[in-house]
Amino acid sequence: MDSPGYNCFVDKDKMDAAIQDLGPKELSCTELQELKQLARQGYWAQSHALRGKVYQRLIRDIPCRTVTPDASVYSDIVGKIVGKHSSSCLPLPEFVDNTQVPSYCLNARGEGAVRKILLCLANQFPDISFCPALPAVVALLLHYSIDEAECFEKACRILACNDPGRRLIDQSFLAFESSCMTFGDLVNKYCQAAHKLMVAVSEDVLQVYADWQRWLFGELPLCYFARVFDVFLVEGYKVLYRVALAILKFFHKVRAGQPLESDSVKQDIRTFVRDIAKTVSPEKLLEKAFAIRLFSRKEIQLLQMANEKALKQKGITVKQKSVSLSKRQFVHLAVHAENFRSEIVSVREMRDIWSWVPERFALCQPLLLFSSLQHGYSLARFYFQCEGHEPTLLLIKTTQKEVCGAYLSTDWSERNKFGGKLGFFGTGECFVFRLQPEVQRYEWVVIKHPELTKPPPLMAAEPTAPLSHSASSDPADRLSPFLAARHFNLPSKTESMFMAGGSDCLIVGGGGGQALYIDGDLNRGRTSHCDTFNNQPLCSENFLIAAVEAWGFQDPDTQ
């Protein structure tokens, strides 16, 4: 290999221009926490040789299946698979979904080598059905490998990781599509300004968010992608979400106020990412990414599982050749103007609310469950109409024409588990909002202030609660497992008082007050600040009710 350690697959001039080889040559650190800090700081980013050594070490330490193909396997099979075909003309495996091989700083020989390696990976991993990130991973690894066989072995170890708590790259359409939905949920929570812009300019927001992995695995320039991959190998999948969120934040900062077209926003983001050096350095991108105070890996895994479950229930497990990705029937499609009738909100307002709900439920269409004008002003009838539906949307219109409400994650039948006593239940996906006189949404306080909580110690006992709190006997059966308060150590239960219902009142939010309190006759209500949502009053603090509605979420396929 030529100095400073480039192999025969790399264009030396491009590599010199992309990465200055000025960094340290050795790494003695063995502690994971220190390694995390060094990866984030880019300790080996300026040394081609050291990055190669670090990749070798980190990938070697990935726990893998007992029989994982190594370099010798590649040497045995490559000739049979490739034959006498020119490597530049080799077809790519179907599982890359027409993703092109990013050249980065590879020469023509290197680009051909990536194709050979991908075909050999397809041969050894027949269970991979969808993996558009793999060409970028192999292309990057080839820059830092001695030869094709070593690069193949590294890729095999990443694909063969069998640590259940360590997710690397998606290898099925179900995993990929649920990650897109999860990313959409995270954007909704942590990049609300950018999400609002995407909703305004795109008819199908999930189609924009479905591109998130491409931003990282293909569009980012080498010096940026390599920095992301450095941290990814140490910290895992969560860093990918972080960086993609940071990219969207920078895109919004640059493009807010500029005209965006619905049919071009996807391409606009790709172009922005390709030219990201004009906007932000790799250091600033990672700095922004790690300034986002995301939930724990465990909570994100719960959300991913919930999204996978929703897709399975809809029969979406493989990509259909005749249609695009499972479309979030978003905004203009989910809420049909010709079919939608409400005494409280307009179609436009319902579309605004729909843009806030979790991705797995935004796939559904609104279904009117209860209307005070149709079913009467009775809380008992409200419960009867809502039971069996999860989640639900509560809408309230006051006699002063104020409009407010709540997204409620859990079936109201849960209230029956408290033996007639008033007990709180629900999850941190609940939120409250007002629409008139102005729009404002208030989410669970922990989303904005994660310092309120920390992951519970192993086998920790549940703290005693002033009010009863419900936990499902089988969390896998819950439709809304994400952000269940039982997964957190909270200083008090006032931060997790989501919803409660008795015969004489309905409450949303608690601690220091109630975000919403409605009496048993659906006649009077009150609203104030509460600890759970850290909200301002949603309307006049004491109000008379003109109308109440409850809406469910109906799968279009069941209509």
From Swiss-Prot:
It is a peripheral membrane protein. Keywords: Cell membrane, Cell projection, Cytoplasm, Cytoplasmic vesicle, Deafness, Disease variant, Epilepsy, GTPase activation, Intellectual disability, Membrane, Non-syndromic deafness, Phosphoprotein, Synapse. One of its GO terms (molecular function) is GTPase activator activity. InterPro entries: Rab-GAP-TBC_dom, Rab-GAP_TBC_sf, TLDc_dom. Its main location: membrane. It is found in: Cell membrane; Cytoplasm; Cytoplasmic vesicle membrane; Presynapse. The modification Phosphoserine is found at S473, S480. The keyword Cell membrane applies. Residues 47-262 form the Rab-GAP TBC domain. GO terms for biological process: axon development; cellular response to oxidative stress; dendrite development; negative regulation of cellular response to oxidative stress; neuron projection development; positive regulation of dendrite morphogenesis; positive regulation of excitatory postsynaptic potential; positive regulation of neuron migration. PROSITE patterns: TLDC. Residues 343-554 form the TLDc domain. One of its GO terms (cellular component) is cell junction. Highest expression in brain. A 1,2-diacyl-sn-glycero-3-phospho-(1D-myo-inositol) binds at K36, R40, K238, R242, R293, L294, F295, S296, R297. Changing T182M: In EPRPDC; uncertain significance. Interacts with ARF6. May act as a GTPase-activating protein for Rab family protein(s). Involved in neuronal projections development, probably through a negative modulation of ARF6 function. Involved in the regulation of synaptic vesicle trafficking. It is linked to Familial infantile myoclonic epilepsy: A subtype of idiopathic epilepsy starting in early infancy and manifesting as myoclonic seizures, febrile convulsions, and tonic-clonic seizures. The Rab-GAP TBC domain is essential for phosphatidylinositol binding. This is TBC1 domain family member 24.
